[in-house]
Amino acid sequence: MNKNSLAFALLALILTSPILSLPAYAADTQSEHSSVRQKVVIQVSDNDPKKWNLALNNAENVQEDIGKNKVDIEIVAYGPGLPILKLDSPVGSRVADAIASGIKVVACENTMRKTKLTKGDMLPNLHYVKSGVPEIMY
């Protein structure tokens, strides 16, 4: 083997060795964090039943894939997305099912105040926060 071939082989080995160890690293990292409770926040700011159904589907899928006991899921509604949480909501039964399965559904009180909605206008068992966007941030 000449010097160029040897240098090339050595360089290839150096460059690929970190890549070859990635699957082992990923497995170690995954097993390390498997006992850590995950947190997911889904924001909905559209008054569109299709988008709400998508958000609810995503939340349910996360619960199924990760496990209800391993993840905290919160759906935060504000702005135009808030009225879908009213008592006459076309997705009210799905929201109720999500809440019953442990998904926290949160309504923005700023939006409620600006749209003159009260807690009496809203679906039961919702959580409330002063402002929706900061809730997503934390």
Outline where the language-model segments fall.
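Bacterial N-terminal signal peptides that target proteins for export
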Residues: M1-L10
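Secreted/extracellular ectodomain signature
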Residues: A24-Y138
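Contiguous hydrophobic segments
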Residues: S5, I14, A77-G79
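Intrinsic disorder/low-complexity signature
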Residues: M1, L22-Y25
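Bacterial N-terminal signal peptides
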Residues: A9-S21
